[in-house]
Amino acid sequence: MVRTNVVSFVLFAAIVLCILYGQKHIAPWIFEDKSICCKEHPSVGRCLPGIDDDAEKDGKCWKFCIEGCETGGFCKLFEHKHICHCNCSG
């Protein structure tokens, strides 16, 4: 009986810790990726292909992405609009 109560308490405590502190605090070896590469960035605003992703024209998507990714970025089509997408470096 006591053993069942102890196991129940340990499981309950683990669930509470997961909810309160989140997974990144429970498993600190799993880091949060702060890289802008391989991601879309709608915050950059409207992306015009051939203009905003052109390195020679100093396009805003290209400028945003080249700061954190060595291969820059391009305007990627999502549904009916283009969004700035930074290329995957490597």
UniProtKB/Swiss-Prot annotation:
Identify the main location: secreted
Chain segments annotated as coiled-coil in the UniProt record: none
Q: Which GO terms describe its cellular component?
A: extracellular region
| Keyword terms of this UniProt record | Antimicrobial, Disulfide bond, Fungicide, Plant defense, Secreted, Signal
Disulfide-bond pairs as recorded: 37-88, 47-75, 61-84, 65-86
Q: Which InterPro entries match?
A: Defensin-like_20-28
Cell compartments where the protein resides: Secreted
KW Phosphoprotein (keyword) present: no
- Signal sequence coordinates: 1-22
What's a GO biological-process term for it? killing of cells of another organism
Q: Which family does it belong to?
A: Belongs to the DEFL family.
Recorded hits in PANTHER family, A to Z, give: DEFENSIN-LIKE (DEFL) FAMILY PROTEIN-RELATED (PTHR34453:SF3)
Give the protein's recorded name. Answer: Putative defensin-like protein 20
- What species was this sequence derived from? Arabidopsis thaliana (Mouse-ear cress)
